[in-house]
């Protein structure tokens, strides 16, 4: 069985995916971690990578292809990604969301590489990231 966990930034996708994969003894994949690795390799923040993705579709393609390949070649795993349910249609799908203030607090607490001066800065960055993602999703995937 393949379980896809989608949701908003800071909603707990990775935490739930890790706990579920441990409970089921499944492999865990995180496309958010994969994107953070790409950002780090390019010397960018995750927000800056999102801005770059607006004009460079090769980054999204790399992430999309990774998910598609996992869905076609592996079984018994949990993956957290905003679009994993789309790219792995034969999966059990979970969507998570939380209040923006809760999400911002989680982001400021959990992700050292994305450190923000305060919760409001995390809220602003989350809103900007979601807006950037939504614009790309409409352009690239028509949803």
Please describe what each predicted stretch is:
Residues 89-111, 117-127:
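Conserved phosphate-donor/acceptor-positioning beta-strand/loop module used by diverse small-molecule
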Residues 22-63:
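Conserved substrate/cofactor phosphate-moiety recognition/catalytic segment
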Residues 16:
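Hydrophobic positions on the alpha1 helix immediately C-terminal to the Walker A/P-loop
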Residues 55-100:
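Glycine-rich phosphate-binding loop used to anchor ATP phosphates in small-molecule kinases
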Residues 116-143:
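Small-molecule kinase domains that catalyze NTP-dependent phosphoryl transfer to phosphate-bearing small molecules
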Residues 8:
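P-loop (Walker A) phosphate-binding loop of NTP-binding proteins
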Residues 5:
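Hydrophobic anchor at the beta1->P-loop junction of P-loop NTPases
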Residues 13:
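Conserved lysine of the Walker
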